[in-house]
């Protein structure tokens, strides 16, 4: 994780007790064990080992994430949309549970499928359920791994599809980019309703009612 400074003021963890419980569980692994349980290189494992054994500086969450989805975000344009960011955008984390854009976190590595003495989905079930239970609806723009942390009666998924001369195709990398681009537009336009989401054009992907289902919104574009 590399830090990028956007001048965000930080806020405290939403689930400090849960993270404090997980920390010693991860701290028990040595470099070689981390290689095995996380399926990473030895070089990566030594870095992860340091995450849990050495004092680390805390940064605003959105300043640390660098995956494909996050690379689509025009974060330097968000300073007039911080209230929307805080109240409408949540980052799912196996280590921290849920994060606001400016929650202060230290670098870490953990996914929901890692074999620990506890089952992470069970561990996070109640706090995550209670956190989201009063929301009217939720739009998931994350992977199935992290979406599975959420239990809510109105959880919507976005299906990005390319129409290749009548053949409907889904490309994993294109989907990741489109998720980030959709989130970026939602933030910049402060989207609040499902109807507003359906008006978005995501790099050529537009809402398709025929391919959509009750809790799955399909966005389709012609394959170039």
Each model region followed by its residue ranges:
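Internal, well-folded beta-alpha domain core
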Residues: 75-224
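Near-N-terminal "mature-domain entry" segment
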Residues: 1-99, 106-110
């Amino acid at each position: 994780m590399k830090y990028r400074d956007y001048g965000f003021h930080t806020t405290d963890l939403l689930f400090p007790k849960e993270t404090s419980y997980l920390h010693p569980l991860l701290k028990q692994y040595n470099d070689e064990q981390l290689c095995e349980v996380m399926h990473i290189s030895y070089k990566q494992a030594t870095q992860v080992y340091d995450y849990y054994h050495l004092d680390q500086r805390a940064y605003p969450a959105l300043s640390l994430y660098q995956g494909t989805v996050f690379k689509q975000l025009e974060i330097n344009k968000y300073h007039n949309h911080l209230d929307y960011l805080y109240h409408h955008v949540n980052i799912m984390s196996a280590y921290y549970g849920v994060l606001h854009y400016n929650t202060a976190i230290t670098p870490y590595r953990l996914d929901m499928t890692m074999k620990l003495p506890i089952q992470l989905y069970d561990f996070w079930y109640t706090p995550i359920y209670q956190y989201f239970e009063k929301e009217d609806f939720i739009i998931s723009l994350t992977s199935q791994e992290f979406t599975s942390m959420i239990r809510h009666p109105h959880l919507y998924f976005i299906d990005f599809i390319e129409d290749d001369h009548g053949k409907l195709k889904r490309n994993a990398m294109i989907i990741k980019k489109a998720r980030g681009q959709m989130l970026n537009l939602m933030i910049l336009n402060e989207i609040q309703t499902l109807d507003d989401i359906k008006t978005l054009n995501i790099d050529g992907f537009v809402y398709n009612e025929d391919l959509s289902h009750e809790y799955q919104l399909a966005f389709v574009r012609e394959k170039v």
